[in-house]
């Protein structure tokens, strides 16, 4: 848009140019996020996360809270140092490790009062309406993207390999 290029209709999205030019202060009502551990280095077998946030609150849906969350970070020296401290009795380190690896199904954070997302207020009366609104917005967005939640997560490897020739990732033994 900024380059005055004719944008093909097949491309989704909304121009950010009015915000850059100072004609608007807000781009969209919500920001959506998604993440998977399926097929990533040191990832859990399948731990999908979807999220939505507005200008104040963030809603996170962890599809498999009964599975330990793992990724490259959990194998890092920093994370291993937290584990070591936790095992030595450091209650703060123990709580950080637990919270990172064992996530509840639903998380809601008040980003104004809790910018580091430490106090999960999901299910509390004070945010019941907010939680329902954000949950509805996330489910509507997921539907618009063809995202079936855990079913989509379980099929993640198929999407990651799309367009690759068989054996393309195999290393050659030739010298």
Question: Where would I find each of the regions flagged by the language model?
Answer:
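C-terminal cap/loop subdomain of S1 sulfatases and analogous C-terminal strand-loop tails that border
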Residues: 5-107, 162, 166
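Long, internal low-complexity/basic segments
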Residues: 89-106, 111-175
């Amino acid at each position: 848009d900024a380059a005055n290029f004719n944008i093909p209709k097949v491309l989704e999205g909304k121009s950010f140019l009015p915000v850059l030019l100072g004609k608007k202060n807000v781009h969209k009502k919500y920001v959506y996020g998604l993440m998977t551990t399926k097929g990533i280095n040191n990832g859990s077998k399948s731990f999908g996360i979807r999220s939505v946030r507005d200008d104040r609150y963030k809603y996170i849906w962890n599809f498999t809270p009964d599975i330990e969350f793992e990724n490259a970070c959990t194998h890092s020296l920093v994370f291993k140092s937290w584990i070591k401290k936790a095992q030595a009795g450091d209650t703060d380190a123990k709580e950080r490790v637990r919270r990172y690896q064992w996530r509840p199904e639903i998380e809601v954070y008040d980003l104004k009062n809790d910018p580091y997302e430490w106090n999960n207020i999901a299910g509390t009366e004070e945010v019941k309406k907010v939680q329902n609104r954000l949950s509805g917005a996330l489910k509507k967005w997921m539907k618009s993207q063809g995202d079936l939640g855990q079913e989509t997560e379980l099929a993640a490897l198929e999407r990651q390999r799309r367009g690759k020739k068989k054996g393309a990732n195999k290393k050659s033994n030739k010298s």
